[in-house]
């Protein structure tokens, strides 16, 4: 690995010369040479050092809802902060024009009508509904006919969906009024104010993707406190001290991965020859759920940043995406179907394929090798180069996780398989999973980036894919 070269003038003028007794000045090395070495070391480590937060705050639970926060530098400050417990929101007589038949054989968010208080993008957020609170009536008033669960209707009380039963009193097309309570998600912020006080700012409760409160100019965010819906008390897993302000980018090797693994792509980016990029994936690549897909999808951000870095680039972006499906789905589609692999993927005749398939996450390493080796052979037959994106993190229980902090290492066999495949074959790997695994160090539970509370990243999450992709390319054209 070759270190990038940085201009040293600013470093030499701003860094103090190490004292003669320091570890950097031992032996016969001259003071000037020592300072130069110190500069090179600082610049080489710069991206990683710059991402680290100033001395992180220490957090300790001293009660069910009380947190002691200590900051030792630049001046020792300690505060005891009382966190407001999860707030129950009461909904009265929410009208549903009709209920579908309850379907027990599908995902919880699809079993029936979705209660609007717990609704996320496309789905509902589980475990927000108070399961003892749900009442369905025939009218909006308290003395209206009340329906009975198990006789007239059924509900998934974890996911907040309700549907009528065929033999019950609820008829097809009959309006129903739902009353219930739920606890929204919330992210509170611990902040160091301009006058060096540690305070707690309460976040806004939302059914999905809550943001931490804004921090004013001159203030420093120290931590976030995560309230994932109904919660009896805080635990260590709810405390997110800010350890890093950004992902710690490593110094790039020379040559950059794209120069080794994507030489034809690099040549076209630099020369201005037409470059067709195919973004191939599932609903995350489709991205139609975003507020501004034309700007926020990972592939749109990627192409915009390529054009910025390579001013002569002449890029055509093609997207082929199929929500809820995976690579096997494409390979199984018959000719003439909207998502036939040979017609829609190979038929696009891309110069560069960038694939994203979180829905392939059920594959183990041998299955990855078998499936992806076939894809690689097909792409090589076209003369196309390939970047594989590792997937984002999804619902913790879908990843066999019990928390959203201390999760640097992705536990999914699929991700291990992708890394092994890329190490064995001439393909580039954009490891977005590593970036998701460190979000907790930035004070963010990764699920707060999921608009559907499951696996649909928002624009911030899309940027993590783009950051991983751009890591492959040299910084200068």
Model-predicted segments: where are they?
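N-terminal secretory signal peptides that target proteins for export/translocation
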Residues: 1-34
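Bacterial N-terminal signal peptides
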Residues: 35-48
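Extended beta-strand solenoid/passenger and fiber regions
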Residues: 54-159, 166, 183-184, 189-191
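Polybasic, proline/glycine-rich intrinsically disordered low-complexity segments
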Residues: 206-260
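Catalytic His-Asp segment of secreted/periplasmic serine-dependent ester chemistry enzymes
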Residues: 253-254, 258, 392-477
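Serine-esterase "nucleophile elbow" of acetyl-processing enzymes
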Residues: 254-321, 339-349, 353
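Internal alpha/beta domain cores that form substrate/cofactor-binding pockets in large enzymes
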Residues: 278, 314-348, 353-355, 360-391
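Solvent-exposed loop/turn segments at secondary-structure junctions
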Residues: 283-287, 322-328, 358-364, 392-396, ...
């Amino acid at each position: 690995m070759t270190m990038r070269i940085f201009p040293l003038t600013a470093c030499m003028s701003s860094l103090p010369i190490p004292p003669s007794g320091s570890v950097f000045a031992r032996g016969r090395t001259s003071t000037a040479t020592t300072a130069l070495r110190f500069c090179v070391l600082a610049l080489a480590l710069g991206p990683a050092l710059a991402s680290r937060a100033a001395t992180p705050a220490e957090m300790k639970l001293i009660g069910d809802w009380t947190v002691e926060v200590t900051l030792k530098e630049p001046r020792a400050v300690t505060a005891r902060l009382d966190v407001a417990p999860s707030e129950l929101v009461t909904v009265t007589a929410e009208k549903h024009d009709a209920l579908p038949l309850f379907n027990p054989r599908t995902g919880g968010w699809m079993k029936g009508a979705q209660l609007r208080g717990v609704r996320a993008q496309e789905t509902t957020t589980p475990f927000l509904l108070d399961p003892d609170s749900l009442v369905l009536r025939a009218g909006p008033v308290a003395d209206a006919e009340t329906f009975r669960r198990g006789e007239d209707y059924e509900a998934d009380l974890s996911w907040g969906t309700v549907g009528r039963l065929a033999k019950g009193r609820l008829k097809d097309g009959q309006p129903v009024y739902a009353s219930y309570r739920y606890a929204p998600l919330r992210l509170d912020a611990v902040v160091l104010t301009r006058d060096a006080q540690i305070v707690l700012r309460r976040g806004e409760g939302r059914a999905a993707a809550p943001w931490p409160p804004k921090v004013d100019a001159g203030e420093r965010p120290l931590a976030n406190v995560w309230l994932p819906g109904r919660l009896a008390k805080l635990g260590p897993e709810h405390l997110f001290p800010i350890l890093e302000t950004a992902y710690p980018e490593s110094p790039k090797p020379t040559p950059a991965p794209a120069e080794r693994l994507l030489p034809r792509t690099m040549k076209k980016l630099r020369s201005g020859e037409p470059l067709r990029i195919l973004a191939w994936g599932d609903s995350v690549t489709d991205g139609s759920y975003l507020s501004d897909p034309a700007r926020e999808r990972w592939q749109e951000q990627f192409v915009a940043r390529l054009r910025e870095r390579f001013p002569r680039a002449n890029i055509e972006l093609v997207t082929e995406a199929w929500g809820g499906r995976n690579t096997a789905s494409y390979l199984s589609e018959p000719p003439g179907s909207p998502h036939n692999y040979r017609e829609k993927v190979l038929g696009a005749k891309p110069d560069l394929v960038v694939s994203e398939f979180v829905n392939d996450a059920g594959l183990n390493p041998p299955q990855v090798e078998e499936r992806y080796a076939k894809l690689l052979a097909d792409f090589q037959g076209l003369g196309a180069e390939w970047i594989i994106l590792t997937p984002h993190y999804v619902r913790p229980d879908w990843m066999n996780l019990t928390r959203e902090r201390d999760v640097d290492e992705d536990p999914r066999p699929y991700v291990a398989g992708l890394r092994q495949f890329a190490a064995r074959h001439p393909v580039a790997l954009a490891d977005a999973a590593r970036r998701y695994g460190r979000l907790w160090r930035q004070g963010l539970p990764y699920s707060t980036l999921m608009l559907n509370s499951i696996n649909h990243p928002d624009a911030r999450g899309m940027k993590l894919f783009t950051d991983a992709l751009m890591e492959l390319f040299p910084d200068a054209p």
